[in-house]
A protein has these predicted regions:
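Amphipathic, small/basic residue-rich leader segments at the start of a protein or domain
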Residues: 1-94, 104, 113-117
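Short Ser/Thr-interspersed hydrophobic loop/turn segments at strand-loop and sheet-helix junctions
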Residues: 53, 76-81, 174, 191-196, ...
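A short core secondary-structure module
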Residues: 155-201
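Glycine-rich beta->alpha junctions and the first turn(s) of the following alpha-helix
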Residues: 198-248
Length: 248
C-alpha cells in the first residue's frame, strides 16, 4: 500500500504539523460538520467516517483510508472523541484491529466490501486460529478444509475465540494440504458464523461471563469466493493478522 509524501506546515497554534495531519484534521472537521455526533445515529456516523477515509487512515482511499501514516489515527480518535462522537472498533476490537487489516491486505475487492459494516459495528468479527491440541503453535492446527466443486467443506474445532457468540463472520485458518509442511498447507477463509454446521459454545468463567468460546465446525460449506488469498497462503494471512494484534 502506498502512502503520501509528507511535508510540514504551520498549524492553528503556530506549531508545525505535517501536511498529512492537516489533511486528516480537515477531513475530520468536515465529517463532524456534516454529521453532528450529538444527533447522528452511531452506525450512520461510523459509516460516514468510513466513507471519509477515517476508519483506518493508513488504508488506501476508497477502502476506509487516506493512504497516510497509521499514527494519524490517534488524531482522528482525539478529535472525534472531543466532539462526542463514537469510537469505531471499540465494540469490535478483533474485527477492527486484526481481521479488517488482514482482509485489506489479502482480500478480494468483494471481500473488502465487508470492511464498511465491520467498522460500523453492524457485523462483529472473530479470529478462528487457536485449537485445543496446538497450544501456542498456531501452524499445528488440525481443522481441515477440503475442496468440493466451488466450495470448501470444513471440519474441526477452534478454542479461546473472543466474541464468537456475537460474530457475523470469522477469519478462519484450516489445513488444506496435509502432505505439505505445516506452514505451507494452510489456507485462510472468511466464514459465516451462522452457517449450518457452525456450533459456538461459550466458555463460562467463574463470574458467569463468557468472553471466550469453543467453535465446532461440522461439514461447514464455505464458498471459494470467501477464500482469503491463494490456497496455501493461510500462514501469510495469519502473520498479517497477528502482527496487527501487536499494534491494535
Amino acid at each position: 500500500m502506498s502512502m503520501s509524501v509528507d511535508t510540514t506546515i504551520e498549524g492553528e497554534t503556530g506549531t508545525e504539523i505535517s501536511a498529512d495531519e492537516a489533511r486528516v484534521i480537515d477531513v475530520v472537521e468536515r465529517l463532524i460538520a456534516d454529521h453532528d455526533p450529538g444527533s447522528t445515529p452511531e452506525r450512520a456516523f461510523l459509516e460516514a467516517q468510513y466513507d471519509a477515509g477515517l476508519a483506518w487512515v493508513h488504508f488506501p482511499e476508497g477502502e476506509g483510508g487516506l493512504g497516510v501514516s497509521p499514527k494519524l489515527q490517534r488524531t482522528v480518535l482525539q478529535r472525534i472523541g472531543s466532539a462526542g462522537g463514537p469510537m469505531g472498533g471499540m465494540k469490535n476490537p478483533i474485527g477492527y484491529g486484526m481481521c479488517g487489516p488482514a482482509v485489506q491486505v489479502h482480500g478480494t475487492p468483494a471481500q473488502k466490501e465487508l470492511l464498511r459494516p465491520l467498522f460500523s459495528n453492524e457485523q462483529i468479527w472473530c479470529q478462528l486460529f487457536s485449537e485445543p491440541g496446538a497450544g501456542s503453535d498456531v501452524a499445528s492446527l488440525a481443522t481441515r478444509a477440503e475442496l468440493d466443486g466451488d466450495e470448501w467443506i470444513v471440519n474441526g474445532q477452534k478454542v479461546w475465540t473472543t466474541l464468537a457468540q456475537f460474530a457475523s463472520y470469522g477469519l478462519l485458518i484450516a489445513r488444506t494440504d496435509p502432505e505439505l509442511p505445516k506452514h505451507r498447507g494452510i489456507t485462510a477463509f472468511i466464514v459465516d458464523m451462522h452457517a449450518p454446521g457452525v456450533d459456538t459454545r461459550p466458555l463460562r468463567q467463574m463470574t458467569g461471563e463468557a468472553e471466550f468460546n469453543e467453535v465446532y465446525f461440522t461439514d461447514v460449506r464455505i464458498p471459494d469466493t470467501m477464500r482469503v488469498d491463494e490456497e496455501g497462503r493461510g500462514w501469510a494471512v495469519s502473520i498479517t493478522t497477528l502482527m496487527n494484534e501487536r499494534v491494535s
